[in-house]
Amino acid sequence: MTNEMKIGKLVLRAALALGLITINVELSAGNAGENQSSVREIVAADRIKASGLDAVYDFDAVSPAARPKGYKPFYISHYGRHGSRYAYARETYTDLLEMLQKAEQEDNITEYGKSLSLRLADFYEKVRYRVGDLTDKGWNQQKRMAGKMHSDYPRAFGKGSNVRACASGSIRSIMSMTSFCTELSRIAPKTEIIAHQGLEYIQATSPNLGTNPFRFKGPKFDFPYAESDEEFLRSFFPEYVDVLGRMFKDPSKAIEGKSHLWTMDYMYMLVGGMNSLDDDVRNDFSDIFTSEEYVKMWEVDNYLRFCEYYWYRTSCSAIFVDMLDKAEKVIASGGSGADLRFGHDHCLMTLLMIADLDHFGHFPETPEELSQYYQTYRSPMAGNLQFIFYRSRRKGAEPLVRVLLNGQDAALGDLAHSESIYYAWSDLRDYLRSRIAMFL
């Protein structure tokens, strides 16, 4: 059953079938394809970027609003990640804590490990019932995003405009949509805003889910690298044992029977996840890794996510199909407004591969070189991909489209711009159709 929220001038009526919502009412990556040392220098110089998927949206690193001469913005097609959240996996908060507590019982813990265990236990009491929830920071990110979209492109939200929003079934995505639409309804009272959540919209929000009955099927692909993510940890960052050695007298005993990769990645997400938490909850666990170790762990996690998201290119093509179809209808109708989709990093990252955005879909010879092109920090909390459509008064003139990733201009592979930073709509449409066809 489809769930809807219809937003009037300043009224939000929520009727979500899940029955779980009561409303009480912070990346720029440089250019993809940079040389290896350049990417690693960027990450080493910026602890937020080194947090990968736990980076937060940087509102200060966006390109100024612009428009081609003789054109006016009339429509925005958007796919956005939910705002900042608590860890999506409980193990982020419990895995290391349980290891430390067990080690203390077995006299296998260092003094540093004892101190860390106490800090973690205290922190866990604050977050144990909040796993996966949107934080206040995440709510405010989406609110601010709505304000910026309206201030940059006010003509898209004038009288007679329509905004259609949909979200995945995740509560953090639904709450992100709610925050965005609530603010937009306040500042754009002439715009009709309809928000949806339901299985009918899964192809536009989270089509890679195994529960998706409409999931696209496509050709089988070979993975480009022989090395598994677990093997990559051991070959690329063998010093991870030093991290464990500061906590445990015998690290091999402490980690026996566990995935070394996930043990380290839960620690990495614990540290980076502090970026998203509110001040009264946040704790500082940055001492778990040295700066050099944290950068290494970014690259390990970067490869881990690639190993997962590579396989979503077929299913996530549904999002681009939805974007193209809805844009065609708006253009044909002469209407204005926006289509907003609220989902997850695994979809946003996959869209970048499908479109080869800034050559994100280029896979070099070895996994050690992958970070030249593929960087998780390009999908921060509240990260988003936007197509901004511009219409000319000249009869027969084709719409132009500006492509923005996290508020910065981005390039679609080697597709030529028709004017400055803008693509002709037919060129962009045909390019994306050709890319989608590769995976279907």
Please identify what each model-predicted range represents.
Residues 1-34:
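Bacterial Sec-dependent N-terminal signal peptides
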Residues 30-164, 168-339, 343-440:
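Signature for phosphate-centric chemistry
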